[in-house]
Amino acid sequence: MASTGQTNNYKQGYSSQTVETQQTRRAESEAAFLLPYIKKTDYILDVGCGPGTITVGFVKYASEGRTIGIDISANVLGRAKAAADEASIPKEGPGSIIFEEGNILEGLAYPDNTFDIVFCAHTLGYMPPPDMPLKALTEMRRVLKPGGILATRDTIEQHFYPRSMDLDRLWVGHFRRAVLKGDPEAEDLSPPFMPALFRRAGFDADGGKVHISTGSTVFSGATTRQWLANRAESQLQPGDPLRRSWLEAGITEDEIHETLLASKKWAETEDAWYAALHCDMLAWK
């Protein structure tokens, strides 16, 4: 399913550095809050699966079920298929996995009440509230079976330490401006509003069918800091989608340059570190 500009707000693009970051994610790190609820026979959909490292990880938990991963990028799906092939996972039958092009905002090609579990990580946070994420949540709920689980993870806070490096403003703040398309009236990104959005999408928040929790990611050490700085440099090069989105949001070339200098200095600072807080949502249809 092809995507259009109106239904694709993903700002980071699929540069090699970006995809390498996504490939570090695993089911055990990004979906630990969901794993205890997966049954061996479950039919699972992973929305915005990227290079498929989380999706592939679901197969051992749904070893007698089936798993599908969808993404808007045909290129990154090629990596996902390669990951499944490398793990010798079949494409049909019990314990199988397939990857398909799809855009949640353009509607999914699956009938109502199809999946036991729908998972979506680090995707809704790129959708300015309320309309885009609400549309996505409503569509994911549609394809869930009655009693099925929708699980989402999105980042609600990011911090770079020491704070004196000012990367909370330069990196996190500029990223926020890009997602919100420079709208000065926008209140915040989508993740802090997830409980309210789940309620509006039709989940019974007052009946004990919506659970909210948090998780975290920490990056530290010289090698990891340099890796993050290299990613920032790659993403802010001319022609990269992230740089383009920053410019479209009104972020200047001087501000981009300042961000890159701060990122480099942070990477070279002994004992500097990064922490992210994630909103983990579980909801039963």
From Swiss-Prot:
Biological process terms in GO annotation: methylation
Keyword line: Methyltransferase, Transferase
Segments for region (Disordered): 1-22
Domain of life: Eukaryota
Enzyme Commission code: 2.1.1.-
Coiled coil: none
Keyword Methyltransferase (UniProt): yes
InterPro entries referenced in this protein's UniProt entry, alphabetically: Methyltransf_25, SAM-dependent_MTases_sf
Oligomeric and partner information: Monomer.
Family label: Belongs to the class I-like SAM-binding methyltransferase superfamily.
Role played: Probable methyltransferase; part of the gene cluster that mediates the biosynthesis of luteodienoside A, a glycosylated polyketide consisting of an unusual 1-O-beta-D-glucopyranosyl-myo-inositol (glucinol) ester of 3-hydroxy-2,2,4-trimethylocta-4,6-dienoic acid. The HR-PKS ltbA produces the trimethylated polyketide chain from acetyl-CoA, malonyl-CoA and S-adenosylmethionine (SAM), and the ltbA cAT domain then uses glucinol produced by the glycosyltransferase ltbB as an offloading substrate to release luteodienoside A.
Full protein name: Probable methyltransferase ltbC
Native organism: Aspergillus luteorubrus
The organism's taxonomic lineage, starting at the top: Eukaryota, Fungi, Dikarya, Ascomycota, Pezizomycotina
